[in-house]
Swiss-Prot record:
Positions bound to S-adenosyl-L-methionine: 46-48, 65, 92, 107, 114
Primary residence: cytoplasm
EC number: 2.1.1.199
InterPro entries: RsmH, SAM-dep_MeTrfase_MraW_recog, SAM-dependent_MTases_sf
Protein name: Ribosomal RNA small subunit methyltransferase H
Family annotation (SUPFAM superfamilies): Putative methyltransferase TM0872, insert domain, S-adenosyl-L-methionine-dependent methyltransferases
Length: 300
C-alpha cells in the first residue's frame, strides 16, 4: 500500500459513546484536581481526547495510534490543545509510559475511516486491495496472509476469529481460487467468492456472508487479540491509585477478554458488572455505534 499522508479526506471518524467515556472518569477521586494526566490508547481521529481536553482545562493527554493517517487527522483536530496533547506513533500494547496516569481509555477495533477508505482494504462495500493493515508499515497484509496459510490453518483462523461455521468450506474455496486463478483482484472478488460458499437463501441477508471472514482476516493481520491480551496485562501498571481504565469493544472476542480481565485481575475493581451500551439516540445518529460495549475498572 502506498502511504500518502496528504490524503486525509477519508478520515472523518465519529467517536462512539463519548458521554459515557466522560462519565466513567468521574469515578476517579481526583478527577477535578489540577495536573491531570491520561492516556488515549487508541487516539483515532482524536474525538474522545478532544472532548476530554475541552472539559478538563488542566488535563494533559498522551495519544497513541499506530495508524499514521489517524495521527495526522488527530493532530489537526486537536491543534488548539497542542500544548496538552502528546501524540505518539505506537501500538498501545508496546507503549511504556514514563509516569503513571489518572486514566486510560481505549476504543478497540477498526474505525470508520479505515472502513470507508477503499484503499485500506478493510471493506467489500467498495473494491480495494486486500490489505487490512491498521499500521500500513506492517509486513503482512491480508493478501499475503491467505496465500501463506495452508487450508487447515486458514480454516482454523476463520473459525477462531470470525466464529464462522462454514470456515472449512470457505478456506477450501479460497485456496482453490488462489491455485487455479492466482491472487484475488481485490476485496469485492474475495467477498463474492466467500458468498458462493453459502446456500442461495443466505447470500442476501442483512449481514453479508463474507462479514465474519473479513473480520477474522483483519484480526489476524493486526494481531488484535494478542495485542489486547498484552495490553490488559500491563495497563493496570500505568495507573495511579484509584485510576480508571475504560474500554469500548465491538465484538464478542474482545468483550470476553475485557470482561474476564476486569473480573479476575486482583489489581482492579470491576465497576461494570454488565457493559454500558450506546443510547438509542446515538445509534440513530451513528449506526456503527450499535455493537459498542463499554466496561470500566478502577485500580485498587
Amino acid at each position: 500500500m502506498q502511504t500518502d499522508l496528504s490524503d486525509s479526506s477519508f478520515f472523518n471518524h465519529q467517536s462512539v459513546m463519548t458521554d459515557e467515556i466522560m462519565a466513567s472518569l468521574e469515578h476517579y477521586p481526583l478527577i477535578h484536581n489540577n495536573q491531570l494526566k491520561g492516556i488515549d490508547a487508541t487516539l483515532g481521529g482524536g474525538g474522545h481526547s478532544y472532548h476530554l481536553l475541552r472539559k478538563y482545562s488542566d488535563l494533559n493527554i498522551i495519544g497513541l495510534d499506530q495508524d499514521p493517517f489517524a495521527r495526522k487527522s488527530a493532530s489537526k483536530k486537536l491543534d488548539e490543545f497542542k500544548n496538552r496533547i502528546d501524540i505518539r506513533a505506537s501500538n498501545f500494547a508496546d507503549f511504556v509510559p514514563k509516569e503513571k496516569v489518572s486514566f486510560v481509555i481505549a476504543d478497540l477495533g477498526v474505525n470508520s475511516n479505515q472502513i470507508d477508505d477503499p484503499k485500506r482494504g478493510f471493506s467489500f462495500q467498495k473494491d480495494g486491495p486486500l490489505d487490512m493493515r491498521m499500521n500500513p508499515f506492517l509486513d503482512v497484509d491480508a493478501d499475503k496472509l491467505i496465500e501463506a496459510l495452508n487450508e487447515k490453518d486458514l480454516a482454523n483462523l476463520i473459525y477462531k476469529y470470525g466464529e464462522e461455521r462454514l470456515s472449512r468450506k470457505i478456506a477450501r474455496k479460497i485456496k482453490l481460487d488462489l491455485k487455479e486463478n492466482g491472487k484475488y483482484s481485490g476485496t469485492k472478488e474475495l467477498a463474492y467468492s466467500i458468498a458462493g460458499c453459502f446456500p442461495p437463501k443466505q447470500r442476501y441477508k442483512k449481514i453479508h456472508p463474507a462479514t465474519r471472514t473479513f473480520q477474522a482476516l483483519r484480526i489476524a493481520v493486526n494481531k488484535e487479540i494478542e495485542v489486547l491480551e498484552k495490553f490488559l496485562q500491563v495497563v493496570p501498571e500505568w495507573l495511579l491509585p484509584g485510576g480508571i481504565i475504560s474500554i469500548i469493544s465491538f465484538h464478542s472476542l474482545e468483550d470476553r477478554l475485557v470482561k474476564s480481565c476486569f473480573k479476575n485481575d486482583q489489581r482492579l475493581k470491576n465497576l461494570t458488572k454488565k457493559p454500558i451500551t450506546p443510547s438509542e439516540q446515538e445509534i440513530e445518529l451513528n449506526k456503527r455505534a450499535r455493537s459498542g460495549k463499554l466496561r470500566i475498572a478502577q485500580l485498587n
